[in-house]
């Protein structure tokens, strides 16, 4: 089953962040590690990471979509500390991607 933003935004976000972290051609190692850390935090919160492609082959668009997916979560789920920490790490990675 493929991660779907509508049915499981947590897993979709984690999968996108994992894909960005795995992109060794476009993403510098330090930013990749931030994305992998964010994906790991989301897995701790219950996400199931799957291999999915980057959105349009673009790491920046993929991180932005992951953050958008987290915004679809209900308030209680988003307030979970690992989810908040993952959102912060993703935001920091997005900023550094330029």
Predicted features by range, described:
Residues 62-98:
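Amphipathic alpha-helical binding modules
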Residues 18-21, 37-46, 67, 71-74, ...:
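Alpha-helical repeat scaffolds in large eukaryotic proteins
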Residues 5-12, 58-66:
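Short amphipathic alpha-helical heptad-repeat segments
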């Amino acid at each position: 089953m493929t991660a779907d933003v509508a049915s499981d935004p947590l897993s979709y976000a984690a999968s996108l962040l994992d894909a960005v972290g795995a992109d060794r051609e476009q993403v510098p190692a330090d930013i990749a590690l931030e994305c992998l850390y964010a994906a790991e935090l989301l897995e701790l919160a219950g996400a199931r990471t799957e291999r999915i492609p980057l959105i349009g082959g673009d790491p920046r668009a993929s991180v932005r979509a992951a953050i958008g997916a987290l915004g679809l979560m209900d308030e209680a789920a988003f307030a979970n500390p690992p989810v908040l920490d993952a959102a912060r790490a993703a935001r920091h990675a997005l900023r550094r991607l330029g």
